[in-house]
Design a protein with these regions (language model features):
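Gly/Ser/Thr-rich loops at beta-strand to alpha-helix junctions
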Residues: 10-16, 96-109, 130, 188-199, ...
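Generic secondary-structure signature for well-ordered alpha-helical cores
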Residues: 13-16, 23-31, 83-91, 115, ...
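A glycine- and small/hydrophobic-rich beta-loop-beta segment
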Residues: 242-285
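N-terminal phosphate-binding or glycine-rich loops at protein starts, especially the Walker A/P-loop
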Residues: 2-43, 97, 103, 107-116, ...
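Short, acidic/small-residue loops that bind anionic groups at enzyme active sites
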Residues: 97, 109-138, 148-149, 214-218, ...
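Cap/lid and interdomain-hinge subdomains that line or gate substrate/regulatory clefts
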Residues: 66-67, 134-192
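Glycine-rich phosphate/diphosphate-binding loop of Rossmann-like nucleotide-binding domains
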Residues: 14-26, 33-34, 39-52, 183-220, ...
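Phosphate/nucleotide-donor binding subsite
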Residues: 46-92
């Protein structure tokens, strides 16, 4: 069955590269949907969702965004619109995967478009700034693939063709095998940070009682933040939050903070949560 793969990018600067990805996807028998987050300039490539529609999703006109006179604010507004559009495509079953390419501004656009998508939905970002301080951990979706381009995405050449072909092949492969996550058993999350003894006891005990257990490595944005995200996606029946050292990290400016809203999601959603002060005696800076 053909899949619908969304391509998010700025056609005013990356039309050639986006067209290359679209052609690859279509050669593999799938449908490509281009979402244009560009702001100025013309493009030879017609999008499926125009920049005007993206701006409208953010309750602005393109003229409003141009009038901001600030590239950062402009792309942030377009990112808001792109995120709403991509999420709507997912929610209506009109998208099976999303890929984006970009430099600094295009990366902001793509990451925002992927951020609200659920765990398990295929998402891949090709970026020239993937592994730099410009991309913070909290900007990235929990299970998103980040691909660093070794050269700038400024037209097609022997290197960019290979990078984009690999990225397109990856997202096609993920779309072909991806299915919506079905929680067949009650799912319980347990947090840990290199503390194994209680997990070795709790996990089999819960499994014997018909539960499935997911262990969260509580190491900040890819730990406790992941837990809060999974809870908000309503995938869990309860939480054993026995390793809460990320709170100390947050209070003391530690490197492994999970943000100021740690411990809040379970109560907001309304599922049982047991909390213990595990790993509170140290933090990282």
């Amino acid at each position: 069955m053909a899949k619908a793969i969304v391509i998010v990018g700025t056609l005013d600067t990356k039309a050639e590269e986006i067209g290359f990805i679209r052609d690859f996807i279509e050669r593999k028998g799938h449908k490509a949907l281009i979402v244009d987050g560009g702001i100025t300039g013309s493009t030879p490539l017609a999008p499926d969702i125009s920049r005007e529609e993206v701006a409208g999703a953010a309750e602005k006109t393109l003229a409003d965004i141009i009038a901001l006179g600030n590239e950062g604010k402009a792309i942030a507004t377009m990112a808001e619109g792109a995120a709403k559009i991509v999420h709507a495509l997912y929610s209506t079953g009109s998208a099976d995967a999303v890929i984006s390419i970009g430099g600094s501004m295009g990366t902001s656009l793509g990451l925002a478009a992927m951020k609200r998508l659920p765990i398990g939905f295929p998402k891949l970002m090709v970026s020239t700034i993937a592994f730099t301080p410009l991309v913070t951990a909290d900007a990235i979706a929990m299970d998103q693939i980040m691909m660093q381009s070794p050269v700038d995405l400024w037209g097609l050449n022997v290197i960019t063709r290979r990078i984009l072909e690999s990225a397109a092949a990856a997202i096609v492969g993920m779309a072909e095998v991806s299915e919506k996550i079905l929680v067949e058993k009650p799912l319980v999350a347990v947090t840990t940070r290199g503390i194994l003894k209680y997990v070795n006891w709790i996990k089999p005990m819960l499994e014997e009682r018909g539960y499935e257990v997911v262990v969260i490595h509580a190491v900040g944005m890819v730990g406790g933040k992941t837990l809060e995200t999974v809870v908000r996606h309503r995938m869990l029946c309860s939480v054993l939050d026995l390793c809460t050292g990320e709170i100390i990290e947050e209070m003391n400016g530690g490197a492994l903070t999970a943000g100021p809203d740690r411990l809040e999601a379970a109560g907001q959603i309304g599922i049982p949560q047991i909390v213990a002060p595990g790993s509170m005696e140290f933090w990282h800076w």
